[in-house]
């Protein structure tokens, strides 16, 4: 039985941790095989490149945090679905005069300006996002969106998809 293993002392292209000897989670990115330490980092790196956001790697000042794999599967449905319930949103979401919704979030794992840029670019491309502003220093952000086009759960899921954890901040 043949086992694929990473060469010794190779480091993850996404998070910078040492790549384990067992398992091969590498990706070919722009014609170069890049080592990844886990399927989570490989998935996030693939998402970043698939969405044309590879400048993130050029401008970041430190490796990204290691990705903790999602504890849910697509078959289990949307893990953020409860955030779409009015009784839960009422504590966290405010309404604008134009009929949009606004939420403030705490976003963990931000380590540099490139993280902020990545989140703003990735989420900002979603249909229905009217405004997104992230402060990398405080790790807080505000998002304004059109609820008929996009749900809060879709926004939270998009943030998680690129490796960040977003926690809504109570508005009251």
Locate each region found by the language model.
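Flexible metal-binding regulatory segments at protein termini and peripheral loops
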Residues: 1-172
């Amino acid at each position: 039985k043949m086992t694929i293993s990473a060469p010794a002392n190779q480091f993850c292209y996404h998070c910078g941790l040492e790549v384990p000897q067992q398992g091969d989670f590498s990706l070919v990115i722009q014609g170069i095989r890049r080592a990844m330490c886990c399927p989570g980092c490989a998935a996030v790196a693939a998402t970043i490149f698939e969405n044309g956001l590879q400048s993130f790697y050029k401008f970041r000042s430190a490796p990204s945090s290691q990705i903790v794999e999602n504890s849910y599967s697509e078959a289990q449905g949307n893990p953020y679905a409860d955030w779409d319930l009015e009784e839960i949103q009422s504590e966290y979401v405010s309404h604008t005069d134009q009929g949009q919704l606004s939420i403030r979030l705490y976003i963990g794992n931000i380590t540099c300006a490139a993280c902020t840029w990545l989140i703003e670019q990735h989420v900002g491309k979603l249909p229905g996002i009217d405004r997104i502003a992230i402060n990398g220093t405080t790790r807080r952000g505000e998002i304004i969106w059109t609820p008929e086009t996009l749900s809060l759960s879709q926004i939270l899921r998009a943030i998680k998809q690129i490796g960040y954890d977003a926690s809504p901040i109570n508005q009251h």
